[in-house]
A protein has these predicted regions:
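Acidic helix-start/capping segments at beta-turn-to-alpha-helix junctions
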Residues: 37-54
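Periplasmic OmpA-like peptidoglycan-binding domain that tethers envelope proteins to the cell wall
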Residues: 50-56, 64-67, 115-119
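Stable alpha-helical elements in mature extracytoplasmic
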Residues: 16-23, 47-48, 132, 136
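Solvent-exposed coil/turn segments that connect beta secondary-structure elements
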Residues: 43, 55-56, 128, 165
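Catalytic cores and adjacent binding grooves of peptidoglycan-active enzymes
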Residues: 71-166
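Active-site acidic/histidine clusters and adjacent loop/turn architecture
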Residues: 2-42, 60-78
Length: 166
């Protein structure tokens, strides 16, 4: 039986519905994946700002602008402005958080939306063997229960969006 693990169980396990767990387990069985590690689910505005900050530091502005839409780009612009002003990490994340809240967290990232309507799940690519990744990706692409699926290098993680049944 495949297993779903959480990088941060106390934060994330309650944000993945029984329905989404069934979807993931079905995909894992079909693709022959014994285990996955979920790295992120629903986020607060502050968590979203922190993650965006870390990704901007690691991947750069240009790369991250390809990942987000117009609202996310405004947060990236806020990062760039604060960075140019010589602000420290905590000040930059605080400024980004304020901007996210002003724009509406759900507009910036679906991770900041309502999990009772949409489960947004990031899976660590490293939790899936390289040889199994193409079958895993194909299985997800063929599953109508997944509304959006992003893969590296566009997204650092496997990013799945699973609409919740009414």
């Amino acid at each position: 039986m495949p297993t779903i693990q959480f990088l941060n169980p106390s934060r994330d396990s309650a944000n993945v519905s029984a329905y989404s767990k069934t979807v993931l387990l079905d995909i894992m069985r079909i693709a022959g994946i014994p285990q996955i590690v979920i790295t992120s689910t629903t986020r607060t505005a502050h968590e979203q700002a922190r993650i965006m900050y870390e990704n901007l530091e690691q991947h750069g502005i240009e790369h991250q602008k390809k990942l987000y839409g117009p609202y996310g780009d405004k947060i990236i612009d806020e990062y760039a402005i604060l960075k140019r002003k010589g602000k420290i990490k905590t000040e930059i994340i605080s400024g980004m958080t304020k901007r996210i809240n002003a724009l509406g967290p759900r507009n910036v990232s679906k991770h900041a939306g309502d999990p009772s309507k949409l489960n947004v799940i990031d899976i660590a690519p490293g939790s899936i063997t390289i040889s199994a990744r193409s079958k895993f990706e194909a299985t997800i692409n063929n599953d109508d229960r997944i509304s959006t699926f992003l893969t590296p290098p566009k997204d650092p993680a496997y990013h799945l969006e699973i609409p919740q049944p009414d």
